[in-house]
Regions:
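Hydrophobic residues embedded in beta-strands of well-ordered beta-sheets
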Residues: 78, 130, 160-162, 197
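Structured extracytoplasmic
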Residues: 22-147, 169-175, 179, 209-238
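Subset-of-secretome marker
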Residues: 183-184, 206-208
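Sec/Tat signal peptide C-region and signal peptidase I cleavage site
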Residues: 16-21
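Sec-dependent N-terminal signal peptides
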Residues: 4-14
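Long, charged/polar, surface-exposed segments that mediate recognition or autoinhibition
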Residues: 148-149, 156-170
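Beta-strand-dense domains in secreted/periplasmic systems and polymorphic toxin scaffolds
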Residues: 165, 200-202
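Extended lipid/amphipathic-ligand handling interfaces
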Residues: 153, 185-194
Length: 238
């Protein structure tokens, strides 16, 4: 059963050794400024100038589906459905997919809305990474989720970008009438290619109930690969 109101994407980041950071006011201000510049770098990346592939996997209550999509910005139809459930996409499926992409192409992922910068707090830092937590409110999850979602980001110092964002709930919440979410975990991973900040992987895990009797048990994983810049090279390097 499709639940389009939950198409978010997630996963928890793998653990690694860090040294506890001294959360002094000066350090906190400095780290917040780094995060803000990283968000600007993400905002300045024009994703429409890149070709890439997306491999999608979904498991909804045991109903498994997969697809491979391709983005070609210079083509007449920039989005192409290549495979669905391991088989080449039919003409009908390709046409339906292209129409759907036209309807949703203006929907953009906004880090600035996701990360509450005022609430940023340092968890730890070392010579490679800064880990910070923040408050989360996602409009699509409804007002009942306020105060029940937490976020964590990993800032990569050398390349100066946000490498990963994790979101999870600390209490059950109701995103819409008759739906109850007990477990939610989302992860957005990014890659830095010549200064452009692009999606690497999105994963979501969610459990709960719908209409009191229907179980919600979903996993989705989107993997992005084969990035090739299709714009002017001086625009990428400047």
């Amino acid at each position: 059963m499709k639940k389009n109101y939950y198409l978010l994407l997630i996963c928890f980041c793998a653990g690694f050794n860090v040294v506890a950071a001294q959360d002094t006011p000066a350090e906190l201000t400095s780290f917040k400024e780094k995060v803000d510049r990283a968000i600007i770098k993400f905002e300045d990346t024009n994703k429409q100038l890149w070709s890439y592939n997306i491999s999608r996997y979904e498991n909804e209550e045991g109903d498994i589906s997969s697809s491979i999509e391709q983005h070609l910005p210079q083509a007449n139809e920039p989005w192409l459905l290549k495979q669905i459930n391991g088989q080449p996409a039919t003409h009908k499926q390709i046409k339906k997919f292209a129409k759907k992409q036209q309807q949703t192409r203006n929907i953009q992922f906004k880090l600035r809305e996701l990360i509450n910068q005022e609430s940023l707090s340092v968890v730890s830092a070392n010579e490679k990474f800064i880990i910070m937590t923040f408050n989360v409110f996602m409009k699509k999850l409804g007002k009942d989720s306020i105060g029940k979602l937490q976020g964590k980001l990993i800032y990569q110092k050398e390349q100066q970008f946000i490498q990963q964002i994790s979101i999870w709930n600390n209490a059950a919440f109701t995103p819409m009438f008759t739906a109850n979410i007990t477990d939610l975990a989302i992860t957005f991973s990014f890659v830095n290619i010549n200064g452009a900040i692009l999606a690497k992987q999105n994963e979501m895990k969610m459990k709960g109930s719908f209409a009191y009797f229907t179980e919600i048990n979903e996993t989705s994983l989107d993997s992005f690969s084969d990035y090739v810049y299709q714009g002017k090279q001086d625009a990428l390097t400047n």
